[in-house]
Amino acid sequence: MTAIRIRTLALALATTLALAACGYTLRQAQPLPQVLNAVVIEAVNLDSLLVMDLERELKGAGATLKPLNTTGVSVLKIQEETAERNVISLDDRAKVGEYELHYRVVYAVDGADGQPLLRDTPINLSRVYSFDEQQALGAAQEEDLIRSELRREAVRMIL
């Protein structure tokens, strides 16, 4: 083996040992609460990306999704979903330098008996990102990526 290969292998081994020693583990799928094993999703917009992400995560965790108006199952209600973009800073030419994306979801959960288990629970997330007008296409892609990350984080918080 060459010296570079040995160093690379030694560095990888040292990093692995350091991570193991500090207790780091990869995030594992969290078990679903029992109440969400069979669930109906109600939302103002059932075609929203949030609802699609929720459905995918619920199915992946082993939940059974039931059609609307099914009785005897829990109901996950997405009552509000909003996304806003605000200007945070301007440069010396009064051009936008940074934006902040806000993402808000309000949800509730009713049990199979119709009793509220979780009432109007808000999730408020935000991220700041730099904007360069010289790279407007890249900035639009970055904004889309941040929006999808915020949505995925909201899904994790709901479940």
Language-model segments: residues:
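Bacterial signal peptide processing site
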Residues: 23-26
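C-terminal motif of bacterial Sec signal peptides marking the signal peptidase cleavage site
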Residues: 18-21
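Acidic/histidine-rich, surface-exposed loop or edge segments in extracytoplasmic proteins
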Residues: 34-42, 135-139
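Bacterial N-terminal signal peptides that target proteins for export
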Residues: 1-11
